[in-house]
């Protein structure tokens, strides 16, 4: 063949080879793209067990809401002045969160080193025990001590967030995270229902609970039931919850592979005698894969400083602080506002009706998490949805401040009752208020997804812990701050007793401004 002929063939052969290679690569890319779109199967059993443990935390926290003000009043610490009850009940709720602040980071860091199970299960059991004992309190000091102890152990909550993140990936997050977020509103629906229904059970239901013990301790039963639910969850966790800490999971897989290889090598040696090839195969099979080797190199958790200086983590922490402060304040103020008599600046609802109102709010939040949140997370930008949720708070506090003037329009000072028409309007306003207040619930699962998106996987519990610390500090401060603000406003009749409304709306607007930083940081990262 002539050189010219050979030269003329070479480009064609080369082009054919490139075409085949490009076709092969395109098929591979298409297959990879399709594979990425297929959601990873959800570990239903593990998530079910984890949800049973997480389910009790909001119940334990919220079962106090309907009766805590009455409990404090019965203890006598407020000296019979209902205007000061809110201050002391706020302290009870604050010290629980203070205990969490003191232990969250320590427990989260510990779980990043020794595993999730050894920290999560004992902590949940301890919270259950101190919750049951709280119902036996006979003094304000005893109430404070028991709630602090429960709060110290409740600091393990971020570990649950980490386990959920480790059991899921980006392909099934949009489904699992809203389902996980559903646990909190369900707990917030059941907790107040338990508290409002079972307080003074011996008086309400003498045929069923007419025991002298329950007459002496009328708040024991609503504390004991959440304890029992927590014990059931811990029992399930002890027998069925698997360890998810990445370093421990990798070590277990490596050990299982070594055992399997040793067993095969042993049988092969027995049949044919040991050879260099067999030893080489065993050595290769127990070696780390490239992915495992990379994980092994990067398995050391990030330092606290590295997490804090990260702009995205700072934005999430700051926004989370406002979110938790405003969310908890709305619940605390609503409970106190409803408990306070109309002439003292409130609405004057009994504890059982307050419990029903919180239960309705929990059902609303549950339906939103189940029906709306998954679609929202798939359709819209997470940072923008977060900002939208924060916009609900100024409206919540503004509407809440209108309830007392509305109640006063139909209030009879002689009979201490509200006209039925006014009562209907009042309940309608409360329904709208609760709906607005539960819009922000979507922000909590979004916060969890943003943490996973921006934090190193080997420091996930620590990152969750840092965000949870900032949120828990807010939860520790807001019951005392908001209830004291309410008491000061009403007792001194500042702005007609509504100074607290003006201040809470102002804080809400500051929270909206802070939430915009998440969108700014996210956009900047995408541009890089």
Swiss-Prot record:
GO MF terms held by the record: transmembrane transporter activity
Biased composition range(s): Low complexity: 260-270
Span list, region Disordered: 1-20, 260-299
InterPro entries linked to this entry: MFS, MFS_dom, MFS_trans_sf, Sugar_transporter_CS
TM region positions: 87-107, 125-145, 148-168, 174-194, 220-240, 322-342, 357-377, 388-408, 424-444, 460-479, 493-513
Protein topology in the membrane: Multi-pass membrane protein
Record Pfam families: MFS_1 (PF07690)
Record-level GO cellular component terms: membrane
Chief place of localization: membrane
Cell location: Membrane
Keyword tags: Membrane, Transmembrane, Transmembrane helix, Transport
SUPFAM superfamilies, per the entry: MFS general substrate transporter
Role noted for this protein: Major facilitator-type transporter; part of the gene cluster that mediates the biosynthesis of psilocybin, a psychotropic tryptamine-derived natural product.
Family under the similarity heading: Belongs to the major facilitator superfamily. TCR/Tet family.
The name this protein goes by in its record: Major facilitator-type transporter psiT2
Species classification: Eukaryota, Fungi, Dikarya, Basidiomycota, Agaricomycotina
């Amino acid at each position: 063949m002539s050189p010219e002929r050979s030269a003329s063939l070479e480009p064609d052969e080369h082009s054919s080879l490139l075409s085949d290679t490009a076709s092969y690569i395109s098929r591979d890319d298409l297959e990879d793209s399709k594979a990425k779109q297929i959601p990873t199967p959800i570990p239903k059993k593990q998530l079910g067990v984890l949800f049973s443990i997480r389910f009790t935390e909001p119940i334990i926290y919220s079962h106090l809401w309907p009766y805590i003000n009455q409990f404090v009043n019965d203890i006598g610490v407020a000296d019979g002045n209902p205007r000061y009850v809110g201050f002391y009940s706020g302290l009870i709720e604050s010290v629980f969160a203070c205990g969490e602040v003191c232990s969250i980071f320590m427990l989260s860091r510990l779980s990043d080193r020794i595993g999730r199970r050894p920290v999560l299960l004992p902590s949940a059991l301890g919270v259950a025990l101190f919750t049951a004992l709280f119902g036996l309190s006979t003094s304000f000091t005893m109430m404070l001590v028991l709630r602090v102890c429960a709060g110290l152990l409740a600091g393990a909550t971020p570990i649950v967030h980490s386990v959920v993140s480790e059991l899921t990936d980006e392909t099934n997050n949009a489904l699992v995270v809203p389902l996980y977020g559903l646990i909190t509103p369900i707990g917030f629906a059941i907790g107040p229902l338990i508290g409002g229904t079972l307080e003074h059970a011996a008086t309400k239901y003498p045929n069923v609970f007419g025991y002298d013990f329950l007459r002496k301790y009328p708040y024991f039963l609503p504390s004991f039931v959440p304890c029992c639910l927590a014990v059931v969850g811990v029992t399930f966790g002890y027998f069925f919850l698997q360890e998810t800490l990445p370093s421990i999971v990798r070590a277990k897989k490596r050990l299982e592979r070594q055992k399997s290889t040793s067993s095969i090598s042993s049988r092969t040696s027995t049949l044919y005698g040991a050879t260099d090839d067999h030893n080489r195969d065993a050595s290769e099979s127990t070696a780390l894969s490239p992915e495992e080797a990379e994980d092994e190199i990067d398995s050391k958790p990030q330092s606290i400083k590295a997490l804090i200086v990260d702009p995205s983590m700072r934005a999430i922490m700051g926004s989370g602080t406002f979110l938790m402060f405003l969310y908890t304040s709305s619940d605390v103020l609503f409970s106190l506002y409803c408990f306070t008599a109309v002439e003292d600046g409130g609405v004057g609802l009994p504890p059982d009706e307050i419990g029903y109102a919180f239960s309705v709010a929990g059902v609303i939040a549950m339906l939103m998490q189940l029906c709306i949140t998954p679609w929202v997370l798939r359709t819209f930008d997470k940072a923008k949805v977060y900002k939208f949720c924060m916009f609900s708070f100024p409206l919540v506090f503004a509407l809440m401040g209108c309830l007392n003037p509305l109640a006063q329009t139909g209030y009879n000072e002689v009979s201490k009752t509200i006209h039925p028409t006014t009562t209907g309007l009042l309940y309608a306003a409360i329904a709208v208020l609760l709906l607005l207040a539960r819009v922000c619930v979507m922000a909590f699962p979004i916060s969890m997804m943003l943490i996973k998106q921006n934090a190193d996987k080997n420091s996930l519990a620590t990152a969750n812990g840092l965000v949870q610390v900032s949120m828990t500090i807010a939860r520790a401060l807001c019951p005392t701050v908001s209830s004291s603000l309410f008491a000061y406003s009403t007792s001194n009749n500042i702005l007609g007793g509504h100074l607290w409304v003006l201040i809470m709306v102002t804080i809400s607007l500051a929270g909206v401004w802070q939430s915009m930083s998440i969108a700014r940081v996210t956009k900047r990262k995408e541009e890089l």
